[in-house]
Amino acid sequence: AGPHHLHYTALPDWATTLGMVFSVMLWMPSWGGMINGLMTLSGAWDKLRTDPVLRMMVVSVAFYGMSTFEGPMMSIKVVNSLSHYTDWTIGHVHSGALGWVGFVSFGALYCLVPWLWNRQLYSLKLVNWHFWISTIGIVLYISAMWVSGILQGLMWRAYTSLGFLEYSFIESVEAMHPFYIIRAAGGALFLVGALIMAFNLWMTVNAGQASETEGAGALQPAE
C-alpha cells in the first residue's frame, strides 16, 4: 500500500495504482479491528461515564477507525490530486499519531504504573482533565489541518482564464497563517494534557497509597 504516498511522482503509474488498490483493501482489516475493539465493551458502556482511563482507550480506538478510513480514502487518485503535499496529509497523520497512538499509550501508562508499583492511581479527576484537554487539543489540531489542506489544494489548482496560476505560492502560505495558530494552540493543549499525566503518575509512584488488591483494583483513585 506504500506507493499511494507517491502518486504523481516519478514512480510508475501502475505501481501507484496497485498501491491504491491495496490501500483501499486495508479498510476491511482496519475497521474489523476497530469494530472488534469497540464491541468488546458491549454491555458495559456505562463504565465510560465513571472511568476516564477506559474512555481514553475507547476514544483512541475511534481515532484509529477515523484515521484508517481517511488513509485509504486519500489514496484514491482523484482525492489525492487535491490532498497531495498539503496540510490535509498532516491532519490525517496526526489524527492517528495523537488520537490513536497517543491516547492508547496514555491509557496503557495509566494502567501499568499503578500495577507495577502496586499503588492506587493518585487522581482520576486529573485523568479526566487530561482526557478533555487533550481531546480538545487534538480536534483543534486536526480540524485546522484539514481545512488548511483543502484550502491549499484548491488554491494550488486554481487557474485564471488565461491559464496562469491564480494564486502565488506565498499567497497560499499567508492564507494558512490562521490555521497554523489554531494548530499551535491544539498542540499546546495536547502537551498540557501530557504534563498533567506526568504529574499524576509521578504522584502515584511517590505519594500514592499502597493498593490492597492486584491488577485492575489499583486503578481506584487515592483521593
Which role fits each region the language model picked out?
Residues 11-23, 49, 84-90:
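Non-cytosolic membrane-interface motifs at loop->transmembrane helix junctions
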Residues 120-122, 214-215:
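Short, intrinsically disordered/low-complexity patches at protein termini
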Residues 209-223:
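Short, highly charged, low-complexity non-transmembrane loops/tails of multi-pass membrane proteins
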Residues 1-7, 18-40, 54-77, 90-116, ...:
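Hydrophobic cores of alpha-helical transmembrane segments in multi-pass integral membrane proteins
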Residues 82-85, 177:
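Short hydrophobic "helix-edge" motifs at membrane interfaces and signal-peptide entry regions
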